[in-house]
Amino acid sequence: MRLPLLLSAGVLLVVSLPCPPCRALLSRGPIPGARQAAQHPQPLDFFQLPPQPQQPQQPQARPVLYRMGEEYFLRLGNLNKSPAAPLLPASSPVAGGSGSRLSPDEAAANFFRALLQQLPLPRRQLDSPAGPAERGEENALGSRQETPERERRSEEPPISLDLTFHLLREVLEMARAEQLAQQAHSNRKLMEIIGK
């Protein structure tokens, strides 16, 4: 009884000890005109974007928790929300609104829309063996042909999640039937062995 109590007290003491600040979480460099910033760098605020310098050199990446929050809301299907948004919006049932959850199709459409926004578009088809000189001619001629095809693709509805789950159910039923057939076969063999 004493050993678990001592171990848990020791773990709590170790957890509550102050640790040196992590260098990865500290600001990238000293603030111009401040000498104390170089000695005691300030930790980054994860939910706020870093301040933009006077002369933008490169687009800076957003803080880690902000990006993780975006991924969380993306998985929920709410692209319009951000981690900095209030936790209980007016449309949520907990807040008293009459909001409803997105359907699986809408959530999937949101996910794929955000995914396509992040992916770079390919410049040519992978199966075309065109060289650099031929690519310019193909782009000039192929742009007219690709436009109706792109419009046609955009008009087609996305694959329904109902279809996906229907196919999954069918595969599971087939696996279950095969498992029952194997079980019946092994039971027959067992009965033949015992019956002899």
From Swiss-Prot:
Record field: compositional bias (Basic and acidic residues): 146-156
Modified residues (Isoleucine amide): 194
Residue span of region Disordered: 122-158
Keyword terms: Amidation, Cleavage on pair of basic residues, Hormone, Secreted, Signal
Gene Ontology BP terms: negative regulation of epinephrine secretion; negative regulation of glucagon secretion; positive regulation of cortisol secretion
One protein family per Pfam: CRF
Single GO molecular function: corticotropin-releasing hormone activity
Tissue and organ distribution: Produced by the hypothalamus.
Subcellular location: Secreted
Propeptide, residue positions: 25-153
Signal peptide location: 1-24
Major place of residence: secreted
InterPro entries assigned: Corticotropin-releasing_fac_CS, CRF, Urocortin_CRF
GO CC term, one of those recorded: extracellular space
Quaternary structure and partners: Interacts (via C-terminus) with CRFR1 (via N-terminal extracellular domain).
Function: Hormone regulating the release of corticotropin from pituitary gland. Induces NLRP6 in intestinal epithelial cells, hence may influence gut microbiota profile.
Family: Belongs to the sauvagine/corticotropin-releasing factor/urotensin I family.
Annotated protein name in UniProt: Corticoliberin
Organism: Canis lupus familiaris (Dog)
Gene expressing this chain: CRH
